[in-house]
């Protein structure tokens, strides 16, 4: 799809808030409070099933959809979950472009900034939206497939913002009831995702009518996700758009899906966000209206614990934009005994268009589809950064946003354009770039933050575009992006960057494979022969099994070799086993290294996981030695063996490069003739 073999550079934009850190927007209010509910549902909810949490609200000032700060008035979520400390103050989305619909002005921008122009509800028909004040519209939905039986105590602690020890059974039941209400009211007819567990389309995402809450085979949300949140908003409230960005409506509907996995791999530190921008037009829009030079901005105001010592950066290979701590430790995290983390955003997917060419393919609605092509091969097309308290302050209107979207300074505003580089590199010989701070803070090479501007409060902006949206005989057009919000914690500020990049690689790999991670090769079918002080293992007798293993090819992984182990007991794991032999393909692959996080130190390490010698493939072995006890085999003694197959992925950017089959333990007792 993109970036394991494609160079992608990201850049951060860090805004200088005119409102300052003590702005009332940073104060938690009843307007944002999670407990504010309607007869139909709640107006704010939280994604909180893994190691990172995030609030979503449809009540913001003066419009609707937003990510309000609710944790200690400073963060919109926590990392690690339950710590009481977070990384993001606020995040949002902006859309801008040149609109040709018969109205004016041509340049318009709408979205969710510190103030939002998006109000609750979908657009029913061109120019007509749902009533934003209707309790059935002014709400968010949250579901999890296991809500009936799950232990919701930790979930309730996050939702009701109280210590785990103070959560009551009434809290858990109230939350369980809300899950049930959202399940029954799941707005599939508005575009919320759902799936079936049976039939030819089992576990494929569906968007649109057909969901039946009473059908046990129908499940709301993203397949496989532990939790899914959904909301919808639009920009048709002309009073709000003019007030916030000086821009009249465009006729955009924004559908937000957030989901997370509670798992024992790096996905446990990630929240996924799918944003669908549907151009439906205003009431006066022409049937052939279009928007050219469309850009989508995913921006964030990270407060990485203490906001005053943050820096921004990006990885030009991974396409990862992030914020990290300037100092080895962070005051807020140090106060709870934790090292300074890092947080990043990654566009996993940019908008695509229909070409009809069967050689083209793109992910649309979490499904690879032929005949579609991404507008931009690299989904992040601009990445610049701003710092609070510097000469570059927040954009205040559509022309300033449009300059940011194209990699320029917000002022002088469009149609004037000053490249972002000129304000920071101070080198007229440097070719203007849309990608800033793409150096490496760990090795201190390249352009890194903190040299021109001291550490402080940072705002980051990720941009994808340009692309086009158009009405066809009045029919809507859709752009879809998917973003990963990633939290990572190493042993200090710099090792957290390394862990963050590892998690990002894992996220992209999982997404490109639609979260169906490759299974290991099949386990060899082994026959054993118990002889006089000898054991013979033969895994070549079943040719069908051999063919299935040695022709294995899954998601870039190909067969590489066999391992033979002796285990101390029938219940021992491979980590306790003695590797007796490896028979591998004769090629350039010998030692295979994988990245792993040391559970004791949090450091990201490269460790050997498979060790071959180009011995060539064999399908049998004769054993005369007890490798566990380091002595000859003894008749009458039972020994335990396993033969596994392993595969290798040659892609250096794959999150893991070796897969080994599940060991099948064989008990063998040598006997006298």
PLM ranges: what are they?
Residues 1-5:
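Positively charged n-region of N-terminal signal peptides that target proteins for export
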Residues 7-16:
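Bacterial N-terminal signal peptides
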Residues 19-673:
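Extracellular/surface-associated beta-sandwich interaction domains
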